[in-house]
């Protein structure tokens, strides 16, 4: 049987306002629990919410960036439910008239083609508090600092067909949000969270029953979740069972998901207009003023990187997709005056290390100026590319800048011709049989045999021999 996967995403994006969506309480991350929740956030008697104009500005900027219709009349509703981290007993959100209407994001697929993922809408709402389990024995603590933090929830159409497309969309959305400056996108702090709606069906059939897995806070978790849930649903259906429409919770420690509750529909929440908030009217002039100040977006930045720095389509897309990565690259490239080497290091060694340690580039132990200093030492042949990786590792561990590490560890490249000639003579004398075989070999076979001598000399020099000079001297002596 040939199964098809159908995926829709709901993405919660915390907006980078200084205060909450309906109160003046701070949104700063990391404060002591329950020190940033005011009477309005807790819906204490006698309090009234006051909408945060900056949240509307950021939501509209997002809508413009994703080619969406902007709601000229925006209305808030109450979504009624009881949960410990929601002190009001309801969430103030939008249902009938959201701030952002239908739009789309184009994603690039692995084969180089482009696919359009439609956005159904994006609405403003307040975040809930946070349940804390790990710090308590047989109890759950509640931290309400996050309650009332402004969110936009971005809801896609079910246009996504596999995990690669889901992650491509999520990355592109993340890039747009950070490029606009409307959110920091820090998933480790919950600034962007994904709910994944998944169903499977036999090819050509109607949509199957979907499940929703909530609160995924990394691209890696999203991939694993989709893999597991698709496989689970297929196994259930092939065994003759039925899929239960339910909400599931993913555990990032065990990489497993479990049922959380049966999936609710809108009627279950008894939405009704919020009596404390008037409808908000958005004028064409205001929308245009925000359109005029939109910053450079990922697709435009990619095109500029290709033209300005001569980067490949792949490198430009990789480095231009994220505002923080783009800034890091440009600072590095200008400091060392070498865009290509900067691109190679930022997209290669640095990106791999950040990915392994799940760090954002703005939190890298090696900043852009320091990486530029390392690249400068490669360019002036103080060190080789191989040694540069050792230097980078030491810099990552906080042992100083490139010059400090090179000096302290004695890693300067050996470029003295006399010293290199002696190394070559010693290796040739110790391996006369290989020298004779090289000289007797056909020219097309000598290149492979040359690697043996290079390897021996590099071993003797602890990788510090200048490769270009070494090759010249070695070839000269072997061919003589």
UniProtKB/Swiss-Prot annotation:
Ligase recorded as keyword: yes
Keywords: ATP-binding, Ligase, Nucleotide-binding, Protein biosynthesis
SUPFAM superfamilies attached to this UniProt entry: GatB/YqeY motif, Glutamine synthetase/guanido kinase
EC number: 6.3.5.-
Catalysed reactions listed for this entry: L-glutamyl-tRNA(Gln) + L-glutamine + ATP + H2O = L-glutaminyl-tRNA(Gln) + L-glutamate + ADP + phosphate + H(+); L-aspartyl-tRNA(Asn) + L-glutamine + ATP + H2O = L-asparaginyl-tRNA(Asn) + L-glutamate + ADP + phosphate + 2 H(+)
EC class: ligase
PANTHER family referenced in this protein's UniProt entry, alphabetically: GLUTAMYL-TRNA GLN AMIDOTRANSFERASE SUBUNIT B MITOCHONDRIAL AND PROKARYOTIC PET112-RELATED, GLUTAMYL-TRNA(GLN) AMIDOTRANSFERASE SUBUNIT B, MITOCHONDRIAL
Protein family per UniProt: Belongs to the GatB/GatE family. GatB subfamily.
Name of the protein this chain belongs to: Aspartyl/glutamyl-tRNA(Asn/Gln) amidotransferase subunit B
Protein's organism: Saccharophagus degradans (strain 2-40 / ATCC 43961 / DSM 17024)
Gene name of the encoded protein: gatB
């Amino acid at each position: 049987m040939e199964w098809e996967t159908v995926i829709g995403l709901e993405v919660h994006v915390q907006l980078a306002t200084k205060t909450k969506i309906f109160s003046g309480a701070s949104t700063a991350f990391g404060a002591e629990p329950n020190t940033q929740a005011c009477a309005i956030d807790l819906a204490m008697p006698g309090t009234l919410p006051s909408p945060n104009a900056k949240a509307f500005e950021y939501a509209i900027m997002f809508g413009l960036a994703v080619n969406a219709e902007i709601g000229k009349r925006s209305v808030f509703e109450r979504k009624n439910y009881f949960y410990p981290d929601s002190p009001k007993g309801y969430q103030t959100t939008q249902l009938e008239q959201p701030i952002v209407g239908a739009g789309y994001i184009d994603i690039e697929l692995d084969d180089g083609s482009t696919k359009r993922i439609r956005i159904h809408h994006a609405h403003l709402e307040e975040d809930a508090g946070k349940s804390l389990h790990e710090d308590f024995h047989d109890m759950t603590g509640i931290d309400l600092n996050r309650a009332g933090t402004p969110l936009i929830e971005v809801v896609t159409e079910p246009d996504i067909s596999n995990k690669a497309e889901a992650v491509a969309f999520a990355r592109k959305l993340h890039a747009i949000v950070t490029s606009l400056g409307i959110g920091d996108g820090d998933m480790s702090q919950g600034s962007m969270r994904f709910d994944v709606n998944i169903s499977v069906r036999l090819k050509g059939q109607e949509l199957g029953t979907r499940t929703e897995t909530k609160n995924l806070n990394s691209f890696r978790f999203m991939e694993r979740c989709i893999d597991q849930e698709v496989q689970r649903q297929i196994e259930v259906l092939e065994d003759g069972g039925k899929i239960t429409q339910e909400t599931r919770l993913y555990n990032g420690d065990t990489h497993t998901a479990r049922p959380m509750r049966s999936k609710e529909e809108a009627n279950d929440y008894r939405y009704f207009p919020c009596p404390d908030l008037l409808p908000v009217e958005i004028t064409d002039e205001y929308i245009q003023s925000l359109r005029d100040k939109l910053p450079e977006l990922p697709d435009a930045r990619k095109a500029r990187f290709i033209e300005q720095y001569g980067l490949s389509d792949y490198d430009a897309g990789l480095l231009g997709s994220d505002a923080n990565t783009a800034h890091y690259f440009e600072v590095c490239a200008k400091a060392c005056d070498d865009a290509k080497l900067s691109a190679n290091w930022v997209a290669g060694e640095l990106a791999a290390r950040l990915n392994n340690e799940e760090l954002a580039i703005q939190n890298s132990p090696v900043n852009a100026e320091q990486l530029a200093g390392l690249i400068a030492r490669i360019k002036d042949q103080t060190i080789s590319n191989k040694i540069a990786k050792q230097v980078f590792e030491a810099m990552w561990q906080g042992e100083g800048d490139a010059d400090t590490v090179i000096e302290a560890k004695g890693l300067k490249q050996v470029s003295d011709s006399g010293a290199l000639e002696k190394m070559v003579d010693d290796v040739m004398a110790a391996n006369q049989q290989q020298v004779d075989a090289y000289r007797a070999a056909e020219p097309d076979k000598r290149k492979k045999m040359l690697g043996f001598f290079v390897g021996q000399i590099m071993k003797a020099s602890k990788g510090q021999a200048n490769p270009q000079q070494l090759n010249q001297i070695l070839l000269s002596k072997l061919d003589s």
